[in-house]
Regions:
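Short, positionally conserved secondary-structure boundary motifs
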Residues: 1-41, 72, 79, 83, ...
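SH3/SH3-like beta-barrel fold
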Residues: 66, 86-88
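Flexible, small-/acidic-enriched active-site or ligand-binding loops
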Residues: 90-94
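Glycine/charge-rich catalytic "coupling/switch" loops of P-loop NTPases
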Residues: 102-114
Length: 114
């Protein structure tokens, strides 16, 4: 998933990764590889794997995986008066302002391999 400019989303299962049940909020959980640096101030870096609780709603301030048109991105979600703001957590990047988007889920964890 893009942590930068959104990119075309294609559902593709690369692998399965066992996770202890105490770390899983429910069965509707998936993982995504992060590409880009828009979420570095939130501790999400290029190459990380994020854990996402699948749901189609989000509260202001939650980090979400979202579809904008056919492009997927990870950003902080804000529902404002007449639009949605998908805010990067990188001071050098601008927010994405859209009339609507599809929430894929809320990020609740990060795996980092080094």
């Amino acid at each position: 998933i893009a942590a930068g400019q959104p990119f075309l989303a294609v559902q593709n299962i690369d692998n399965y990764f066992p996770i202890p049940s105490e770390y899983m909020p429910n069965q509707d959980t998936f993982m995504l590889h992060v590409k880009g640096e828009s979420m570095i101030n939130a501790g999400i870096f290029d190459g990380d794997v994020i854990l996402v609780k699948q749901q189609n709603t989000a509260r202001n301030g939650e980090i979400v995986a979202a579809l904008v048109d056919d492009s997927a991105t990870v950003k902080t979600f804000y529902k404002e008066t007449d639009h949605i703001r998908l805010q990067p957590e990188n001071d050098s990047m601008d927010p994405i302002i859209v009339a609507d988007c599809q929430i894929l889920g809320v990020v609740f964890g990060v795996f980092r391999f080094f």
